[in-house]
């Protein structure tokens, strides 16, 4: 049985420099260079497509439909943190709404990611604060079931450890392990440059994917010597 407390107050966070650099990349770029791992299920999406978030994960695990631990997490999280909540994908009640999210913004959090329903969509759109969720439900939550703060969680099918790098945009959310995040930044720079060069070649009329014939042969679709 774990001897760790249910609430862990002190965590190691991905550095501010890495967060600032990561914020310049699309989530898709970071997902590619991280080996196409760590992306959350598409159900976890921004309330508005223009919302973006980047920062260290401050993790919360709750029982479906109960938000007492989220209130505790808001009180403990530091400016720049991204609240990442494992709500088990539950859609039967909203875990957060305008009041709690306004408190998150006031405390300087970078954003909130909830693998569960939230509510007050129209007000959130006016809040100018990045929020990602698995859906919406007008029903409110209960506030008495214990949970955990800053333990490893699963949100949207992705493993999230406290302090990991979290980046979200219109495409969804990607999580990169804190220890690996710095090395991913140079790879992301190269990926962006490579894609820009490819877009330029497409604009010149070179639309052929050079790798495709070999891939089709390896898959057994094309015979040796056969071309498209």
Regions found by a protein language model. Give the residues of each.
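Histidine- and aromatic-rich ligand-binding microenvironments
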Residues: 169
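C-terminal binding/interaction regions
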Residues: 166
């Amino acid at each position: 049985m774990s001897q760790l407390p249910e609430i862990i107050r002190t965590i190691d966070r991905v550095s501010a420099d890495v967060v600032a650099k990561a914020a310049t990349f699309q989530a898709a770029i970071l997902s590619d260079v991280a080996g196409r791992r760590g992306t959350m299920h598409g159900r976890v999406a921004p309330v508005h497509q223009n919302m973006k978030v980047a920062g260290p994960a401050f993790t919360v695990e709750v029982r479906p439909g109960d938000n007492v631990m989220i209130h505790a997490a808001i009180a403990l999280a530091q400016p720049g943190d991204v609240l990442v909540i494992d709500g088990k994908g539950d859609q039967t009640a909203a875990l957060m709404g305008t009041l709690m999210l306004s408190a998150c913004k006031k405390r300087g959090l970078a954003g909130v990611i909830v693998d569960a329903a939230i509510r007050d969509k129209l007000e959130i759109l006016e809040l100018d604060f990045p929020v990602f969720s698995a859906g919406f439900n007008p029903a409110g939550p209960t506030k008495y079931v214990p949970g955990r703060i800053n333990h490893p969680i699963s949100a949207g099918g992705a493993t999230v450890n406290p302090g990991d790098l979290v980046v979200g945009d219109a495409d969804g959310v990607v999580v990169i392990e804190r220890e690996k995040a710095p090395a991913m930044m140079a790879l992301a720079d190269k990926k962006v440059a490579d894609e820009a060069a490819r877009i330029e070649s497409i604009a010149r009329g070179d639309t052929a994917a050079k790798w495709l014939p070999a891939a089709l042969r390896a898959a057994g679709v094309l015979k040796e010597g056969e071309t498209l």
